Amino acid sequence: MSEKTFLVEIGTEELPPKALRSLAESFAANFTAELDAAGLAHGVVSWFAAPRRLALKVANLAASQPDREVEKRGPAVSAAFDAEGNPSKAAEGWARGCGITVDQAERLVTDKGEWLMYRAHVKGESAQALLPNMVSTALSKLPIPKLMRWGASDVQFVRPVHTVTLLLDDEVLPATILGIQSDRVIRGHRFMGEPEFTIDHADQYPQILLERGKVIADYNARKAKIQQDAEAAAAKIGGNADLSDSLLEEVTSLVEWPVVLTAKFEEKFLAVPAEALVYTMKGDQKYFPVYGTDGKLLPNFIFVANIESKDPRQIISGNEKVVRPRLADAEFFFNTDRKKRLEDHLPRLETVLFQQQLGTLRDKTDRIQALSGWIASQIGADVNHATRAGLLSKCDLMTNMVFEFTDTQGVMGMHYARHDGESEDVAVALNEQYMPRFAGDALPSSLVACAVAIADKMDTLAGIFGIGQHPKGDKDPFALRRAALGVLRIIVEKNLPLDLQTLTEEAVRLYGSKLTNAKVVDDVVDFMLGRFRAWYQDEGYSVDTIQAVLANRPTRPADFDARMKAVSHFRTLDEAVALAAANKRVSNILAKATEPLNDEVHASVLKEDPEIRLALQVAVMRDKLQPLFAEGRYQEALVELAQLREPVDEFFEKVMVNADDAQVRINRLTLLSKLRALFLQVADISLLQ
């Protein structure tokens, strides 16, 4: 069977830069799924994406589906005909579905009876016939939150479509997709190369677009070129470019023909905190800042033009003129803000609402101040520094700089605190109170900063849950999931001796009578334990390991983590499967027991050697393991408990638990309860699969 190359390119107006990669990857995944579902054999499916196009190229595509044999069994012959031999309605309906008459059906004879049978050799459809609908289906499934209409048509897509190219080798596949008739015409760069040209063969893509259209359609190649050229440009001026992947992706999605250029700004602006300058360059202008070998910001930036200019100096000058007013604004705000101390902004916090039922930002500040001090006392941090940082935590929100450049909240608080002569502990805490801001972000570096960061997040969790506005589905307007995970990460990774129960109770207490949800403490703790589940699943832990630990509802995050690691290690032991099964058996036996058990196992009632040996082992283990449990050394404890496998196996093989003698029966059930209690000190091992 001959193999072909298939090309589809959708030419559009400028696509959303932050969605370009996901659109292209989804297009490829959707189309690959269509090929596989249709049974069309194929090679690599390559995707291409530029600001004004999405494209796929399929190598080694089969010319058609393989032929296949179809068999459809019908009703039994006894039910297919009446006494006079006329076909029944069931038989006629089945035959119609197969496209035949009843008398054309074959007979299938087995030892269980005789049935009507339809057999046919179905020729596979050609790729030419199948591909246009596959493209339409793949496009219809793209993750587009908001569709557009254009012109007089009812067609909808992420952006207006101008060209559709469908080529199977050198053949145009006739189709109307997104309201556009397919052709072999593709468009080049807006200002360079040929604005429009024809492509003769699918194999010419994307090289023909590069040579004639001045468009680098290969997204990853374009990104690599920008990165390489930017690194070289920065090195040329003795620096390193800040090529954060998110900005690099966005810039890659904005240009078809990247030309990297270097510009500069006045050195006087370096007196402004680097974070504010970087925010302006990256956030507003999509420029890459440049740092010197000492890590300090240089008075230069790198940007990417979408055109090769005969006079690049003119483009550079234009970008320098654009950024200067923004940097001048930052300088003005910085100088103006420093005329007041941070704490001078406290009264203005009373004018800003945190949440209608929960009060103002000043109310929140007072709670954070108190909770920060309480947490500091629990974790050994400086209480005075923590309460001071809590008091000042939201003051920078009232400054000109943060009002204009919102992403500088926290970091500007740090700079203004240093200017005011606050301790470094307090200043750093103001910056780090929002950490971690996202998955994988750094954690607060000091105990004082940890206290304030936890206090801020716990205040929000307690307040929002306290008025019954917990997250529902995908809606989480107060980012409570992120806040909960942030608290857990700080406590676990910093190994802080905090308990979620008492922490939540303290956060709730500080709200006084404002909260209406009587179950707020339990709701918050359960929510945070649920975030533990998601976190550990992402870390690769099995669901049953997580469930085994959650069964004990441990509310100290550091303790929870130790239990997770212990159970995960326990599962690698040879004895794990047998002991998990034994725990499950014990759990079932105890669940069915209706008689009250003894407080302790009575040695005098033990009859059989296996139960005597198990009772002795359990007693020895209880004494041996108490120090390990007390110190949270759960992994060592489970390794010790693994030694119970043989006496447990022997007990179940040779001892009848439900003996006729009530005293003996209750004593044996008591022994099993003591055995299970040892494992439950760590987790419910019976839940392991």
Swiss-Prot record:
Q: Does the keyword Protease apply?
A: no
Localization annotation: Cytoplasm
Alphabetical keyword list: Aminoacyl-tRNA synthetase, ATP-binding, Cytoplasm, Ligase, Nucleotide-binding, Protein biosynthesis
Q: Does the keyword Oxidoreductase apply?
A: no
What terms describe the molecular function in GO for this protein? arginine-tRNA ligase activity; ATP binding; glycine-tRNA ligase activity
Per its UniProt entry, which superkingdom is the organism in? Bacteria
Which GO biological process categories is it annotated with?
Answer: arginyl-tRNA aminoacylation; glycyl-tRNA aminoacylation
E.C. number, please? 6.1.1.14
Could you say which enzyme class this protein belongs to?
A: ligase
Question: Which Pfam families does the entry mention?
Answer: DALR_1 (PF05746), tRNA_synt_2f (PF02092)
What's in the GO CC field?
Answer: cytosol
As its record notes, the protein acts as a catalyst of:
tRNA(Gly) + glycine + ATP = glycyl-tRNA(Gly) + AMP + diphosphate
Extract the InterPro entries matched here.
DALR_anticod-bd (IPR008909), Gly-tRNA-synth_bsu (IPR015944), Gly-tRNA-synth_heterodimer (IPR006194)
- Similarity comment: family membership: Belongs to the class-II aminoacyl-tRNA synthetase family.
Q: Which HAMAP family match?
A: Gly_tRNA_synth_beta
Which NCBIfam families does the entry link to?
glyS
Self-association and partners: Tetramer of two alpha and two beta subunits.
Protein name listed in UniProt:
Glycine--tRNA ligase beta subunit
This chain's source organism reads Cronobacter sakazakii (strain ATCC BAA-894)
The uppermost taxa in this organism's lineage are:
Bacteria, Pseudomonadati, Pseudomonadota, Gammaproteobacteria, Enterobacterales
